[in-house]
Amino acid sequence: MTEDIRLVIITGMSGAGKTVAMQSFEDLGYFCIDNMPPSLLPKFWDLVRESGKLSKIALVIDLRSRAFYDEIVRMLNDVAVHGTMNAQVLFLDASDAELVSRYKETRRSHPLARNGRVLEGISRERELLAPIRQAAQLVIDTTKLSPRKLREEIFHNYETETTQAFHIELMSFGFKYGLPIDADIVMDVRFLPNPYYLPELRNQTGMDQPVYDYVMNQPQTEEFYQRFLGLLTTIVPGYKQEGKSSLTIAIGCTGGQHRSVALTQRLGQALGNTYPVHVTHRDIEKRKESANRS
């Protein structure tokens, strides 16, 4: 149903932060398209409704396509004022001085500038977009916003319980197979007693209850678990506040079969009460694969 599709059209002044905005919407799970020709939007909207496969869409439409200016203004006005396509218009703005400064820093030319005069292009663009700015559902002034602060502002306005951007990737692994290169935090649990040396547990993994119980019933395991969980509870909010969209925590033992798997499972349950958590066990099948090859 159309009511179930959330469409955000990102527009505004050139240099005001539309690229950062689009990247932020991508992290919120939106399907994003940059600089779509306005003539294609009605057809695209029909395809979206017919397919039913997309529920969150963000489009950047601005005056870079100068040849389509009349279409752009008419389309944005229809969306903002008349509510066509069940869309919301997000308008990004900044002061003339800040926009000039940003253009000087990047050494790019303004799309509406004549003879390279940036301020002239900004003035013309501001005049042309004035009706859209007035009718937009949300205007964000980025003059004093860093990219991270703009990202936070967009999250504040568009993040919902079902589209939470921040999530935790929790991974077990075996040191003998190498460190996970994408991990933000790596914890070595090879100091814990190893179930591998118990014949009845050797061919099981931390996913099996006997191994899980053996690992968790060790006195040092409980003390370590509580301390490590306390550390994560303290530092994870800081990672989120700094603008990370995901945090990868890797827990390693020798082969990635027993200790790391059991602890990753338990931590996943605990952290999952507060954050979206995805648990993977990178090397849990490695021994089975080796046995099959030999």
From Swiss-Prot:
Superkingdom in the source lineage: Bacteria
Binding-site residues for GTP, renumbered to this chain: D62, L63, R64, S65
Alphabetic keyword roster: ATP-binding, GTP-binding, Nucleotide-binding
Binding site for ATP: G12, M13, S14, G15, A16, G17, K18, T19
Reported function: Displays ATPase and GTPase activities.
Coiled coil: none
Protein's name in the database: Nucleotide-binding protein LVIS_0651
Organism field: Levilactobacillus brevis (strain ATCC 367 / BCRC 12310 / CIP 105137 / JCM 1170 / LMG 11437 / NCIMB 947 / NCTC 947) (Lactobacillus brevis)
